[in-house]
From Swiss-Prot:
One of its GO terms (biological process) is folic acid-containing compound biosynthetic process. Pathway: Antibiotic biosynthesis; candicidin biosynthesis. InterPro entries: ADC_synth_comp_1, ADC_synthase, Anth_synth_I-like, Anth_synth_I_N, Chorismate_C, Class_I_gatase-like, GATASE, TrpG/PapA_dom. The active site is at 82 (nucleophile), 169, 171. Its EC number is 2.6.1.85. Residues 96-117, 192-219, 693-723 are annotated as: Disordered. Disruption phenotype: Disruption of the gene abolishes production of candicidin. It comes from Streptomyces griseus. Involved in candicidin biosynthesis. Catalyzes the biosynthesis of 4-amino-4-deoxychorismate (ADC) from chorismate and glutamine. Pfam families: Anth_synt_I_N, Chorismate_bind, GATase. Keywords: Antibiotic biosynthesis, Glutamine amidotransferase, Multifunctional enzyme, Transferase. Residues 98-114, 695-704 have a biased composition (Basic and acidic residues). SUPFAM superfamilies: ADC synthase, Class I glutamine amidotransferase-like. This is Aminodeoxychorismate synthase.
């Protein structure tokens, strides 16, 4: 079965791609609704067409594009999903307007006629809806075939042409028997007599879609490197080890599982750019350049940063010893949110800091907290390993010298002068932005907007002193300290963006939904139940899970994308969080960097559909996010990648402190609660500065359930917070 899948710039299209591949036995051809290579005669190469969901309205030609003509002509079987359904109905005389209420990421029990698309499906059918508009009136030639419990038309068919539409999303993980519905569309196509035999449709007629078909970068003769390693029993504190080996070096970094325990807190990595093969790379998205420094000299090349990174990694062939972890040196650092301009986003705002900074680490230390083993790693080229082995010996001696040493006490008096904390958008301004978000949702422009604010202050805070305090008051499995010249990043992130192991197994763990810990076991249990059953939190989480499935699916082997477990309440020292896990397997013809490009920025920091929602965010937030909302982690020489989402993170640069906070705005959101959520998420900063959140009108609990009154309650008793 040859299917043309037209993408209306949605964030669920590749979920349809994988479902259709399973139903048809071959992959559909994907084009966007404004594909310049498209011409109507190309339809003859296909058996049927699926018109994807998408933002906007079918009344706006730019939102529906070439789908309008395909739907109007009805030359071959067409299935419209959500926007595709609305546009197809509009093309044949139906009316499309506002639904009684926006419903995004919410389930409904749909009653149907049991024929056509619904043959053999349960009655009623549980489906997931993502829509603000609906078909409100049908002409005689269109027939309704399904309805929701609130009376909204959920499916239709044309009485004489092979056209079908569904308002709900069969590709959502929350929709019952979505695969079966698409298989029924395949069967309807076969009955219509459109089935063609032979190879994949569209071969030689349309350019391959990107990035799902993006091939690995090719270079000239690869540079051959080798990793040598030394393991030692851990007898030293991680903070002491970093302070002794790397802190005063060039571009020191520490990927710090400051909350060891469990799978997410097993490893910490630290290093710098002091070795003989070390390099640094910085991106400037607006200039379209990458500046690389090596051996004391800098050079600037014109290139998109992720393209440059992929080519650089493709030009290395590294022999790696057997190690019990994926990190074996490579590029370490941060990708800023404005790098979205290379990932279907716009270059709307210029960040005051580099759009990405990575260190090519040729020397590093890895701490395995589970086995209490330390690994020293060094990179050598050709047979020149004497210097590397000398470093291994020197590092071992330094560690031996600090074995058993406790970290220095944090300062007993303020170590900085910090001005008042100011918000980019004060409380009234932020509430107005939330209202605009909900207007956009009601108009069908977006399902969910991850709106953020930026807290800023003048400060002379010392990065190392501040990070030492931060990791005590807000330990996290994905904490990080990056002291990269004029910019320092101090992160206490709990969220994994994307991990890819050396065998191509991918994993993302989006978080949507947070509650503080209770003061008593009874209150704690009640908070867990409330989080697990809250319709708003589940809707937020489901939307991002479906988006992440799409993002990973763009570079994944067909049928390998799995969301399991979902909607799990994970309990940490300070919070309960609603977490889902999405896994997939990287395609043979793709690459780890391509997978990062396809998923960046993380959907939990944008909302959905991602591209349209990022445009809304650009307009409303009125400034750059910088490192906040980007990613921190590594691209290993083994091909492995592990990146966190940059949240709960302090950025110090140019005598200024910045700390981003935000939350997902959906139709069910209460604006006052959304502002309060930003205050709750600022708890690590508030403790660090011993201050209150600007504009907060009511007292609340911070992230560990203690009263958030600007004090340092809950901090270690021997700690006096700087500033």
């Amino acid at each position: 079965m040859r299917t043309l899948l037209v993408d209306n710039y949605d964030s669920f299209t590749y979920n349809l791609f994988h479902y259709l591949s399973r139903a048809n036995g071959r992959e559909p051809e994907v084009i966007r609704n404004d594909d310049p290579a498209w011409r109507p005669g190309l339809l003859d190469a296909f058996d049927n067409v699926v018109l994807s969901p998408g933002p906007g309205t079918p009344h706006r030609p730019a939102d529906f594009g070439l789908c309008a003509r395909i739907a109007e002509e009805g030359r071959l079987p067409v299935l419209g999903v959500c926007l595709g359904h609305q546009g197809m109905a509009l093309a044949h005389g139906a009316r499309v307007g506002r639904a009684p209420e926006p419903r995004h990421g919410r389930t409904s029990a749909v009653r149907h006629d049991g024929t056509g698309l619904f043959e053999g499906l349960p009655q009623p059918l549980e489906v997931v809806r993502y829509h603000s508009l609906a078909v409100t009136e049908l002409p005689p030639e269109l027939e309704a075939t399904a309805w929701s419990e609130d009376g909204v038309l959920m499916a239709l068919r044309h009485r004489t042409l092979p056209l079908w539409g569904v308002q709900f999303h069969p590709e959502s993980i929350g929709t019952q028997d979505g695969h079966r519905l698409l298989a029924n569309f395949r069967d309807l196509t076969e009955r219509h007599g459109r089935t063609r035999h032979g190879g994949r449709a569209g071969h030689g007629t349309l350019p391959p879609p990107a990035p799902a078909r993006e091939t690995k970068a090719t270079t000239g003769t690869p540079r051959r490197l080798r990793v040598i390693a030394k393991s030692l029993p851990t007898r030293w504190d991680a903070e002491v080890a970093f302070d002794s080996l790397f802190r005063t070096g060039d571009h020191p970094f520490w990927l710090d599982s400051s909350r060891p325990g469990g799978e997410l807190g097993q490893l910490s990595m630290m290093g710098d750019a002091s070795g003989p093969l070390a390099r640094t790379a910085k991106a400037d998205v607006h200039a379209g350049t990458v500046t690389v420094r090596a051996d004391g000299a800098s050079s600037t090349v014109e290139s998109a940063f992720l393209t440059w990174l992929e080519n650089d990694l493709a030009g290395l062939r590294t022999e790696v010893p057997e190690l019990p972890f994926a990190f074996a040196l490579g590029w370490v650092g941060c990708l800023g949110y404005e790098l979205k301009a290379e990932c279907d986003g716009d270059a709307a705002h210029r960040s005051p800091d580099p759009d990405a900074v990575l260190v090519f680490a040729d020397r590093a230390l890895v701490l395995d907290h589970r086995t209490r083993t330390t690994y020293l790693l060094a990179l050598v080229e050709d047979d020149a390993e004497a210097e590397a082995r000398a470093w291994l010996a020197a590092a071992s001696a330094t560690l031996d010298a600090v074995a058993g040493r406790e970290p220095e006490p944090c300062p007993e008096a303020p170590v900085c002068t910090t001005g008042p904390v100011e918000l980019r958008h004060d409380r009234d301004g932020y509430l107005k932005l939330i209202d605009v978000c909900q207007q956009e949702i009601a108009a069908g422009e977006t399902y969910e907007v991850c709106l953020t604010n930026m807290a800023e202050a003048d400060t002379d805070l010392t990065p190392w002193a501040a990070y030492r305090a931060l990791r005590r008051v807000s330990p996290a499995p994905f904490a990080a300290f990056l002291d990269f010249g004029p910019m320092a990043v101090l992160s206490s992130s709990p969220e994994r963006f994307l991990r890819i192991d050396r065998h191509g197994r991918m994993e993302s763990k989006p978080i949507k939904g947070t509650r503080p810990r209770g003061a008593t076991p009874q209150e704690d249990a009640a908070l867990v139940r409330a989080l697990a059953t809250c319709e708003k939190d589940r809707a937020e989480n489901l939307m991002i899970v479906d988006l992440v499935r799409h993002d990973l699916g763009r570079c994944a082997e067909v049928g390998s994308v799995v969301a399991d477990p979902v909607f799990q309440v994970e309990t940490y020292a300070t919070v309960h969080q609603l977490v889902s896990t999405v896994t997939a397997r990287l395609r043979e013809d793709s690459s780890p960097v391509a997978a990062v490009r396809a998923a960046f920025p993380g959907g939990s920091m944008t909302g959905a559909p991602k591209i349209r929602t990022m445009q809304i965010i650009d307009r409303l937030e009125g400034g750059p996010r910088g490192v906040y909302s980007g990613a921190i982690g590594y691209f290993s020489l083994t091909g492995a990648v592990d990146l966190s989402i940059v949240i709960r993170t302090v950025v110090l640069s140019g005598g200024r402190l910045r700390y981003g906070v935000g939350g997902a705005v959906i139709a069910l959101s209460d604006p006052a609660d959304e502002f309060e959520e930003t205050a709750v998420k600022a708890a690590p900063l508030l403790r660090l500065l011993d201050t209150a959140f600007p504009g907060r009108e009511r007292p609340g609990k911070d992230l560990d359930g203690e009263p958030d009154d600007g004090t340092d309650a809950g901090a270690p008793k021997d700690l006096v917070l700087p500033g």
